[in-house]
């Protein structure tokens, strides 16, 4: 009977966070913080500018939190940015940082791919391979699939939405609020 319960519980955890996802922090951290965000969402931009660096310093770098960013684009521009982040591969989080900090430069740009390619080159990525990736439909499908899974698994309808050790938290959060939520998850 215990084996059945363990197997059933592991099936519930599976969609929560895969060890294969590109993440910041220790894979075995006691807290997993997932953000469903959109690169053009003003509250997501604020989170990445003001809150995430502090969460990283106090929790991720200390091995207490594993952070995973999943795309939930709320505009066509955010879809393009999400694909660019996916195409950055192991430089995924560096590209997310670049995209969030330069959203005003690419949000309404006619040729977003040109801007994304410059950002990729600045990260040391192969520009030709990166541009080829941007036109690969697989990455767009991955972004759409991530968004559909978010709707199905966590009833995500807007951004930012956070999942902290399985607990769904919606809306903009300050560092103090995030700290409280993380500490609750630790205890």
Q: What are the functions of these language-model segments?
A:
Residues 2-75, 141-152, 183-187:
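Extracytoplasmic thiol/disulfide redox context detector
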Residues 12, 18-20, 80, 102, ...:
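Glycine-rich, flexible loop/turn motifs
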Residues 39, 45-121, 126:
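Structural alpha/beta surface segment adjacent to cysteine/selenocysteine redox centers
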Residues 28-30, 81, 158-159:
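A structure-centric signal for secondary-structure junctions around beta-strands
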Residues 38, 52, 118-187:
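C-terminal cap of thioredoxin/glutaredoxin-like
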Residues 21-24, 35, 39, 64, ...:
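General secondary-structure edge motif
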Residues 2, 8-9, 18, 61, ...:
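Serine/threonine-rich low-complexity intrinsically disordered regions
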Residues 24-27, 32-35, 86, 107, ...:
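Short N-terminal micro-motifs specific to bacterial/archaeal maturation
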């Amino acid at each position: 009977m215990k084996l059945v319960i363990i197997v059933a519980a592991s099936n519930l955890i599976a969609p929560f966070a895969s060890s294969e996802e590109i993440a910041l922090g220790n894979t075995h951290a006691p807290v997993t913080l997932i953000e469903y965000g959109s690169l053009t969402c003003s509250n997501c931009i604020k989170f990445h500018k003001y809150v995430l660096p502090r969460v990283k310093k106090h929790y991720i770098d200390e091995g207490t939190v594993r952070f995973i960013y999943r795309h939930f684009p709320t505009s066509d521009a955010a879809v393009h940015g999400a694909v660019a982040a996916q195409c950055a591969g192991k430089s995924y989080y560096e590209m997310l940082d670049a995209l969030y900090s330069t959203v005003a430069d690419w949000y309404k740009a006619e040729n977003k791919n040109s801007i994304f390619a410059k950002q990729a080159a600045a990260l040391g990525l192969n520009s030709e391979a990166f541009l080829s990736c941007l036109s690969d439909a697989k990455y767009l499908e991955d972004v759409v699939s991530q968004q559909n899974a978010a709707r199905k698994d966590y009833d995500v309808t807007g951004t930012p939405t956070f999942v902290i050790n399985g607990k769904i938290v919606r809306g903009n959060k300050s560092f103090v609020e995030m700290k409280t939520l993380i500490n609750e998850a630790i205890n």
